C-alpha cells in the first residue's frame, strides 16, 4: 500500500493538543456525547490521537504492519457515523476481545470502507431475512 501523497500535510507540525481538538471536531464529539458515555468517547479520541501523533514508520492493524501514513490518512477521514458504527458494533459483539486496543484500531481503520456494506446487509436482512 503506497501513501498517496509525497507532500507533507499541514497537520504534520501539529502538537498533540491541537491534533486532539481537530479529531474531536471532525467526529462531532459534542453530538456523540449526547449518545455515548464520556469514557467510551475519550478512549476513542485518545486512540485516534495516538495514531495521528505517532512518529513510528508502521502500525499493526488487523495483524499486518501498515505504513503509518496510510493509516493516518484513513484516520483523518473518520467522521461521527464511523465512530457510532464502531461503538455500536462493540456493544453487539459476544466474543471476548483479548486485545481491545488492537480490536479498536482495526475497527476504526476499516470503518470508512465497511460501513456502507454493513448498512446494506442490515437492509437486506430486514427486507428478506425474515422470510425463512
Predicted feature residues:
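Electrostatic interaction modules used in gene-expression and signaling proteins
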Residues: 1-132
